């Protein structure tokens, strides 16, 4: 190497070192003026399931990006409050935040279902596009503001399965009188199909199914369902999970606690929730296929829903949407926006995604 090149290289290295040192000093100086914050995050999940990773990711990344000044401790369902009472606890300020599914709270506002997933709705990719680019998140946050809460998407399981059944379900008539664990608007659809709907937190599903308190149950997909042991309590595994094609989980934050955070911490928190979305979805996409292979090898019977059931469920779903829109202004506002976005993105994805997937999957 020529002497001039050596000198230039040395100069660049020196400048780079100085710049990094300056940046680190400036960052430390900025963070030195920021407060130490300690939050508690209740959740709707057992720690053993993949859904808990959304809460863990947010907590881990917030701590890392603030050099430990802002720490959030996630708790499993039941450790602080019951799994289906996260919104109540956050609203009351019992905890600063919680990780949950918004559709658990449609009794408070039916439109909250759109924050998670609705029957025959958007897949995970489409859901994110609607939330972040189609105005969906702003619309949902407007509803949550009525509860003194702000929400941020923080995880997705991807398209879910259609549930575990102790007997085969070949037609709509086979659903009548069946006791099934299924929440959200999907539960309302099943109810109209004759199902006796139950809503249970994840940690209670296996025992209820195993002991005959329920005849069927849906949770997430092969990876988590296997962990819960649902394959040991029922044999028939149905697909697709038409009621949750792209469910998003949320972090709910008490607005008073949120407004007390420095702007820097708010931005870090939001960044961590976006990372939680990617982390959880990637995990489920990678692990569900492996788990399904194990389940099938162990005797699980994989069965598609009949066209009769699918068509009946789809019709009832949109009947319920229209009924809710006619009597609930917030639901109507979100639904009309969502419906327009769904129509547009479905048309586009038929061209760019579905055409390829249909060919590629059929040619394997």
UniProtKB/Swiss-Prot annotation:
Annotated control of activity: Pyruvate uptake inhibited by 2-oxobutyrate, 2-oxovalerate, 2-oxoisovalerate, 2-oxoisocaproate and 2-oxo-3-methylvalerate.
Any one annotated GO CC term: periplasmic space
Binding locations of Na(+): 160, 218-219, 244
Keywords: Metal-binding, Periplasm, Signal, Sodium, Transport
Disruption phenotype: Impaired pyruvate uptake.
Keyword DNA repair in record: no
Molecular function as annotated in GO: metal ion binding; organic acid binding; organic acid transmembrane transporter activity; protein homodimerization activity
Localization annotation: Periplasm
InterPro entries membership: DctP_fam, SBP_TakP-like, TakP/all3028, TRAP_DctP_sf
Residues engaged in binding substrate: 103-104, 160, 181
Signal peptide per UniProt: 1-26
UniProt-listed GO biological process terms: organic acid transport
Annotated family: Belongs to the bacterial solute-binding protein 7 family.
Function: Part of the tripartite ATP-independent periplasmic (TRAP) transport system involved in the uptake of monocarboxylate 2-oxoacids. This protein specifically binds monocarboxylate 2-oxoacids including pyruvate, 2-oxobutyrate, 2-oxovalerate, 2-oxoisovalerate, 2-oxoisocaproate and 2-oxo-3-methylvalerate. Is not able to bind mannitol.
Quaternary structure annotation from Swiss-Prot or TrEMBL: Homodimer. The complex comprises the extracytoplasmic solute receptor protein all3028, and the two putative transmembrane proteins alr3026 and alr3027.
Protein name from the UniProt record: Monocarboxylate 2-oxoacid-binding periplasmic protein all3028
Organism annotation: Nostoc sp. (strain PCC 7120 / SAG 25.82 / UTEX 2576)
């Amino acid at each position: 190497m020529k002497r001039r090149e050596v000198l230039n290289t040395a100069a660049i290295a020196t400048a780079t070192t100085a710049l990094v040192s300056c940046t680190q000093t400036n960052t430390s100086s900025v963070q030195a003026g920021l407060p130490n914050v300690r939050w508690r995050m209740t959740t709707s999940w057992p720690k053993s399931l993949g859904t808990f990773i959304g809460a863990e990711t947010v907590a881990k990344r917030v701590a890392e990006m603030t050099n430990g000044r802002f720490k959030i401790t996630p708790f499993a369902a039941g450790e602080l409050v019951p799994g289906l009472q996260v919104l109540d606890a956050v609203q009351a300020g019992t905890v600063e935040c919680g990780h949950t599914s918004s559709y658990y709270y449609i009794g408070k506002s039916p439109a909250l279902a759109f924050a998670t997933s609705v029957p025959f709705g958007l897949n995970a990719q489409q859901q994110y596009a609607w939330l972040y680019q189609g105005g969906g998140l702003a619309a949902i946050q407007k509803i949550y503001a009525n509860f003194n809460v702000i929400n941020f998407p923080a995880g997705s399981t991807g398209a879910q399965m259609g549930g575990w059944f102790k007997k085969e379900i070949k037609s709509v008539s086979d659903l009548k009188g069946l006791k099934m664990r299924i929440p959200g608007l999907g539960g309302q659809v099943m109810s109209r199909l004759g199902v006796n709907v139950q809503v249970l937190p994840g940690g209670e599903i296996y025992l209820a199914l195993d002991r005959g308190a329920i005849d069927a149950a849906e949770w997430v997909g092969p990876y988590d369902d296997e962990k819960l042991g649902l394959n040991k309590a029922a044999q028939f595994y149905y697909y697709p999970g038409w009621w949750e094609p792209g469910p998003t989980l949320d972090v709910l934050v008490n607005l008073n606690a949120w407004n007390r955070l420095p702007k820097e911490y708010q931005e870090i928190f939001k960044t961590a929730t976006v990372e939680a979305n990617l982390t959880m979805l990637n995990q489920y996409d990678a692990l569900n296929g492996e788990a399904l292979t194990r389940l099938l090898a162990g005797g699980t019977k994989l069965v598609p829903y009949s066209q009769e059931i699918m068509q009946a469920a789809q019709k009832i779903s949109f009947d319920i949407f229209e009924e809710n829109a006619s009597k609930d202004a917030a639901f109507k506002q979100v639904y009309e926006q969502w419906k327009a976005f769904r129509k547009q993105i479905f048309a586009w994805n038929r061209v760019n995604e579905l055409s390829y997937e249909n060919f590629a999957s059929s040619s394997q």
